[in-house]
Amino acid sequence: MAASGSATAGGHWFSALALGVTLLKCLLIPTYHSTDFEVHRNWLAITHSLPISQWYYEATSEWTLDYPPFFAWFEYALSHIAKYFDQEMLNIHNLNYYSSRTLLFQRFSVILTDALFVYAVHECCKCIDGKRTGKDLTEKPKFILSVLLLWNFGLLIVDHIHFQYNGFLSGLLLLSIARLFQKRHIEGALLFAVLLHLKHIYLYVAPAYGVYLLRSYCFTASKPDGSVRWSSFSVVRVTSLGLIVFLVSALSLGPFLALNQLPQVFSRLFPFKRGLCHAYWAPNFWALYNALDKVLSVIGLKLKLLDPSQIPRASMTSGLVQQFQHTVLPSVSPLATLICTLIAILPSVFCLWFKPQGPRGFLRCLVLCALSSFMFGWHVHEKAILLAILPMSLLSVEKAGDATVFLILATTGHYSLFPLLFTAPELPIKILLMLLFTVYSISSLKTLFRKEKPLFNWMETVYLLGLGPLEVCCEFLLPFTSWKLKYPFIPLLLTSVYCAVGITYAWTRLYASVLTGSLVSKTKKH
């Protein structure tokens, strides 16, 4: 009876958290939406009005279909519900079409598909180590994790204000992770394969999946020292995984292969002509690289080491542009970013293979793959930081060191999303939601690990507190100075570079913990 009552109570608090955040999402329906709103409306129109043979060729709008086929079919399914709201939104020639019914349909399509994310969070909570439990419900790791995921600030503003479907996609990722924790490897692999054909950004974490499944599922045993026992290789298991990948890929890409359109599909999915950085530099290594190039350019001009006529005008005046031309440092090619990304990922993958630490080792590798790709990838969007923040939430409630990395990563990464919402009415909303989430995250994790050393040292504390003055400077001071006209890019530049420092630090610290953890494990066994 006691166990039954406890389970019921547990179900009640989780349902209350999910219902509460759903109501908040409904309140955000009238807020600002970005051009992504028109992007997805146009995709509804394309998939509804045209035969499949024209989906990846249609270019009436500049917002062409550039997601994998499963997402196109997802839009197709939504379009058959959308027609009951407003048929005009499905007209390809109605560019930038907007109506109150279109707004309601698209907003609620995001809210309702978030049900998958809610279910995935519930499943992830079952995978949390229950050794560290508090007396009160609010001190329990499962409760804290539920809040960190369900009420994630980044998902709220990116999906339910800016407008995207990251919750639904992140739900598939988290559910796949949960299935691997539960040793339901085939289900986990299937979910991830489907996810790859919904949004190809998840290719970034595919190495973690591939190595983990091969090492921990296809090889059924290890030697006493932890190394792989080659004789334990299971042909049946590797064949089953191969069949999953093949069948899902065939279902997704098969129709376009039959139409001889695969090159066209891939050209839409991987548009390398876009340039190294997005219009607003994602806070990664290349933001620091670009900023250093600007500093060196200014110094070179002051010392008359550079010829002003030879400096690309866009790089020194308009600031944050897509096709960034370097002045002093070497320009970066897509191949260079790919090589840097692979080099950054390899150590974590090697640790996963040679010193496997179960599902948690896989999860650390996944986060490092996501972060490494964010740090060094080509044309990275700032929103891609959520790919690392959400899985890192699972680790944050189990170890103090991981909690520190999560708090620095989440606080810095979430703040870097502020430029997405640049309209005045949304300013108090984003500041309030960010403060609430950040204060809760820090206070709850500090309480959870109160018996251990402080989560932050003085340097980390000063850095995080520095986000306050940065926001005041960018939002309330610089816009009222003469710099606004002369250097309009300065607020974005400061935000990008400052946040890049924090994210780089979090990535470095997490990597150090993984590498030193492997060394400690090896020492203990010897």
From Swiss-Prot:
Keywords: Endoplasmic reticulum, Glycosyltransferase, Membrane, Transferase, Transmembrane, Transmembrane helix. It is an enzyme of class 2 (transferase). Its main location: endoplasmic reticulum. It holds the Pfam family Alg6_Alg8. GO terms for molecular function: dolichyl pyrophosphate Glc1Man9GlcNAc2 alpha-1,3-glucosyltransferase activity. It catalyses: an alpha-D-Glc-(1->3)-alpha-D-Man-(1->2)-alpha-D-Man-(1->2)-alpha-D-Man-(1->3)-[alpha-D-Man-(1->2)-alpha-D-Man-(1->3)-[alpha-D-Man-(1->2)-alpha-D-Man-(1->6)]-alpha-D-Man-(1->6)]-beta-D-Man-(1->4)-beta-D-GlcNAc-(1->4)-alpha-D-GlcNAc-diphospho-di-trans,poly-cis-dolichol + a di-trans,poly-cis-dolichyl beta-D-glucosyl phosphate = an alpha-D-Glc-(1->3)-alpha-D-Glc-(1->3)-alpha-D-Man-(1->2)-alpha-D-Man-(1->2)-alpha-D-Man-(1->3)-[alpha-D-Man-(1->2)-alpha-D-Man-(1->3)-[alpha-D-Man-(1->2)-alpha-D-Man-(1->6)]-alpha-D-Man-(1->6)]-beta-D-Man-(1->4)-beta-D-GlcNAc-(1->4)-alpha-D-GlcNAc-diphospho-di-trans,poly-cis-dolichol + a di-trans,poly-cis-dolichyl phosphate + H(+). It is found in: Endoplasmic reticulum membrane. It is a multi-pass membrane protein. One of its GO terms (biological process) is protein N-linked glycosylation. InterPro entries: Glyco_trans_ALG6/ALG8 (IPR004856). The chain crosses the membrane at residues 9-29, 108-128, 143-163, 188-208, 238-258, 334-354, 361-380, 400-422, 427-449, 461-481, 487-507. Belongs to the ALG6/ALG8 glucosyltransferase family. PANTHER family: DOLICHYL GLYCOSYLTRANSFERASE, DOLICHYL PYROPHOSPHATE GLC1MAN9GLCNAC2 ALPHA-1,3-GLUCOSYLTRANSFERASE-RELATED. Dolichyl pyrophosphate Glc1Man9GlcNAc2 alpha-1,3-glucosyltransferase that operates in the biosynthetic pathway of dolichol-linked oligosaccharides, the glycan precursors employed in protein asparagine (N)-glycosylation. The assembly of dolichol-linked oligosaccharides begins on the cytosolic side of the endoplasmic reticulum membrane and finishes in its lumen. The sequential addition of sugars to dolichol pyrophosphate produces dolichol-linked oligosaccharides containing fourteen sugars, including two GlcNAcs, nine mannoses and three glucoses. This is Dolichyl pyrophosphate Glc1Man9GlcNAc2 alpha-1,3-glucosyltransferase.
